[in-house]
From Swiss-Prot:
Protein name: Probable glutathione transferase omega-2
Domain GST N-terminal: 25-105
CDD domains: GST_N_Omega
PROSITE patterns in the cross-refs: GST_CTER, GST_NTER
């Protein structure tokens, strides 16, 4: 089976039948095509070339059976061993895959380096709440400047933390790079929509962030990352609907 088979399948929702368990040797990822947290698992599986299939879930009308995969009904969830095992949460699944496939390990095995990558990811993750606040400001001018400023501050902090080509501190992307990329990609999509966006959609994120701009272009051009991503026009279209309160989880299909 190819990596990420079914990534663009239509969502399963309440009333839809539960799919048969994945066969032995196949890793199933429960996903939503535009969710940055689920995309972390997709990118990791893609980079590590894990034979996997993707089942997309409707996050407003979740199937009852899905709560047996993830007790909160969130994505991502990883299902394996013919449905006997489940691993949940966007940072735990990548680490689990590294332990399962150590020959293609991304997260360092050295305890100190491993902790440093996790701590760095926590610092970079400040972009996530700032993104959602700025997104809500798209249709509400009240407090917009403050929300934009908080998002810019998250980018300024990341620019300082990026001391080389990658947040891994090495010659190729690492754990923090792959897991934080989806959040920056969402800001890129949002830059096409926001009134008076503080970021450039042409040379994202813009001239004030030269290191991040190079980093983003590099990550975005990696084939395995692209395979786990939605095209820009799809992301922009989805978020246009999302900001109107009518998200279409099958947008573009």
């Amino acid at each position: 089976m190819p990596v990420l088979a079914g990534i663009n399948s239509k969502v399963l929702k309440n009333g839809d039948s539960e799919p048969s368990p994945p066969p032995a040797g196949i890793y199933r990822i429960y996903n939503m095509r535009f969710c940055p947290w689920a995309q972390r698992a997709l990118i990791y599986a893609s980079v590590k070339n894990v034979p996997s299939e993707v089942i997309n879930i409707h996050l407003k009308e979740k199937p009852d059976w899905y709560f047996s995969k993830h007790y909160k009904g969130q994505v991502p969830a990883l299902e394996l061993d013919e449905g006997k095992k489940h691993v949940i949460e966007s940072a735990h699944i990548p680490e689990y895959l590294d332990d399962l496939f150590p020959e293609s390990r991304i997260l360092p095995s050295d305890p100190y380096e491993k902790v440093q990558q996790k701590l760095l990811l926590e610092r970079l993750a400040a972009v996530a709440p700032a993104f959602y606040a700025a997104a809500q400001a798209a249709n509400n001018p009240e407090g917009r400047d403050e929300k934009y400023a908080a998002l810019v501050k998250a980018f300024e902090d990341a620019e300082k933390l990026l001391t080389g080509d990658f947040f891994s501190g090495k010659a190729k992307p690492g754990f923090a790079d792959y897991l934080i990329f989806p959040n920056y990609q969402r800001v890129f999509w949002l830059s096409h929509i926001l009134p008076n966006s503080p970021f450039s959609s042409e040379s994202f994120p813009g001239p004030n962030f030269p290191k991040l701009a190079k980093w983003y272009r590099t990550l975005d051009s990696i084939p395995e990352v692209a395979a786990a991503s939605q095209p820009t026009e799809m992301g922009v279209g989805f978020f246009n609907d999302y900001l109107k309160g009518t998200p279409n989880y099958d947008y573009g299909l």
